[in-house]
Amino acid sequence: MTETADAMQPAPNEAREQWTELAEEVRQHQFRYYVRDAPVISDGAFDTLLGQLNALEEQYPDLRTPDSPTQLVGGGFATDFTSVDHLERMLSLDNVFDESELRGWIAKVEQETGPELHYLCEVKIDGVALNLVYENGKLVRAATRGDGRTGELVTLNALTINDIPERLTATDEFPIPTLLEVRGEVFFRLEDFAALNASLVEEGKAPFANPRNSAAGSLRQKNPAVTARRRLGMICHGFGRMEGFEPASQYDAYVALAAWGLPVSTHTSRVVGADAVVEKMKYWGEHRHDVEHEIDGLVVKVDEMSLHRRLGTTSRAPRWAIAYKYPPEEVTTKLLDIRVSVGRTGRVTPFAYMEPVTVAGSTVSLATLHNGSEVKRKGVLIGDTVVLRKAGDVIPEVLGPVADVRDGTEREFVMPTHCPECGTLLAPAKEGDVDVRCPNQQHCPAQLRERVFHVSGRGAFDIEVLGYEAATGLLEAKVIGDEGDLFSLDAEKLIEVPIFRTNAGALSANGKRLLANLDSAKDKPLWRVLVALSIRHVGPTAARALAGEFGSLQRIREASVDELAAVDGVGSTIAAAVVEWFSVDWHQQIVDKWASAGVRMEDERDDSIPRNLEGLSIVVTGSLETYSRDQAKEAILVRGGKAAGSVSKKTAFVVVGEAPGSKHDKAVELGVPVLDEDGFRRLLEDGPDAVAPTDLDVSE
């Protein structure tokens, strides 16, 4: 009785002040995480703060109000998207952080339900929650979690995610329910995240720090086309309101979802008892980087649905599920210095030089800080102890300083005003840019070195022997003045470079290999030439599109901005950069030098391949048996067609393979002809007239 009476005593003023400060701090971090997608502390540090707030409210229950951060899922902050109420609340999950806590939760559950339950063990995806509502099998809305009761409407954006079907597929075993509210996680597959960051770097933009933040930002784009280009994925893992669907277990529900065409995880296991759950927890802790996406824990759920109702929920989380959180992949290290480097397009980038530290299985001593504004935003000083995060193969990121351990010896980083390599005054390329650049593009030693090295890259001429050391050696020995001289190198010139000369004064084996590689590179396809020219924003994807459309460097040079921008996959920014590049005299001199040395400046047309798709826009969706996605696109391009990424009224055909997603439905809606793989093959061989009416599936 005494304990109960004490618990009901009102909180003293000191406790109320502590609660106010702590609640405000938690709200600020929720805002940074859920709204700005830019957290400044680790998940572990946030969990600690929330735990302190929760403990204070446990001690003084009158502090726990409905608007307390402990009672809200995700903070509930307003954004630009239309608000929509969920049919049933989207709850969060309570967390445990070690084996004893996990076993304690299982013991508590089984004390109420009986021993040896079936549990589902699901990898916890580090992504963004999404709520889908299907009525009679059709997706009618998609919304973010928001505060758990109200989210943001993102239906158009969700429809661009290939994993999310616009219509469910009925089966004899699993009829379509009249109403299905299903929850899941939107995420980046690691290879897609790496490709996105590579393209951003190609365009001179700062890469995303981690897949979770970029998934959130990509889903919440005002323009759904941007979301579509980001290649997001989704996995379903929970349910809200359901009508006409009463699964006996969570496992059975997942089987039905998969049958209807909804994405479910292939990493889920059904086990019995605490020992088996702990075994799975340890297994995924050791194999968390073997998964195609980032995971930050293991979700354990009681499998039987009737027990869900029996166990019930708290105000924010179900009692029948728990999240075991793995230790965050963050460490602290000393920031020894911040230095800048000058890239091939003149962009000046500050880098953090740190005491080497092991994180996520690799040793890290260097991390980009992107630009001077980012250094200020993070608030790091030279000499700081900083928090470094690296998950799997993701780019290491300095999250911020540990300010409490500063001793006064730290100093502020000052972005240079002049190029550290050539002394030229730095300036942004255009007003409003956060990046500064060295405008001395032709003669800056750093830019020269980076451009020569870039020529050898796998996306350009792919010359293995021409590494960074070789590029530096060639320039320092003055056997080349710029990248334009590379293909004019011969043995007599190369022997003047120390790294290509033997002790006996002869040309080294690597020197001979370099000459052979340069000679074979002259016959590489046009798109590789375009990439090698270091035109800003032009990476392999845009280069392939331009080469496929125009066929020769001369035609690309003569094209207008509008003509270039009309090419699928190019757009106005890249088009303007191409026109600007060719307007510079010394750029043209590089092209002329390469052409004089025998570098191929146009793609030879294979006369055996008909140009029978000239001007036709064709979309390929789903998996084809005899063509990879790239092979299918290449087959369209060489026949004069355009391999488009989205369906519109201008689309001539949509080619459908396995698991096509919403593009098939869009084609049907617009009346665009749909071809299976056999129809696609006939289209390639004999053109659109050869596609018989029976090949045009517009009925489904």
Swiss-Prot record:
GO CC term, one of those recorded: cytosol
Q: Where does Zn(2+) bind?
A: 419, 422, 438, 444
Give the EC number: 6.5.1.2
Cite the GO molecular-function annotations of the record.
Answer: DNA ligase (NAD+) activity; metal ion binding
Q: Which PROSITE patterns match?
A: BRCT, DNA_LIGASE_N1, DNA_LIGASE_N2
Q: Where is the BRCT domain?
A: 608-697
What reactions does this protein catalyze?
A: NAD(+) + (deoxyribonucleotide)n-3'-hydroxyl + 5'-phospho-(deoxyribonucleotide)m = (deoxyribonucleotide)n+m + AMP + beta-nicotinamide D-nucleotide
Q: Name one GO biological process term.
A: DNA replication
Say yes or no: keyword NAD present.
yes
What InterPro entries does the annotation carry? BRCT_dom (IPR001357), BRCT_dom_sf (IPR036420), DisA/LigA_HHH (IPR041663), DNA_ligase (IPR001679), DNA_ligase_AS (IPR018239), DNA_ligase_CS (IPR033136), DNAligase_adenylation (IPR013839), DNAligase_N (IPR013840)
Mind listing the UniProt keywords for this protein, alphabetically?
DNA damage, DNA repair, DNA replication, Ligase, Magnesium, Manganese, Metal-binding, NAD, Zinc
Give the protein's biological function: DNA ligase that catalyzes the formation of phosphodiester linkages between 5'-phosphoryl and 3'-hydroxyl groups in double-stranded DNA using NAD as a coenzyme and as the energy source for the reaction. It is essential for DNA replication and repair of damaged DNA.
Q: What is this protein called?
A: DNA ligase
> Which organism is this entry from?
Rhodococcus erythropolis (strain PR4 / NBRC 100887)
Gene, per the UniProt record: ligA
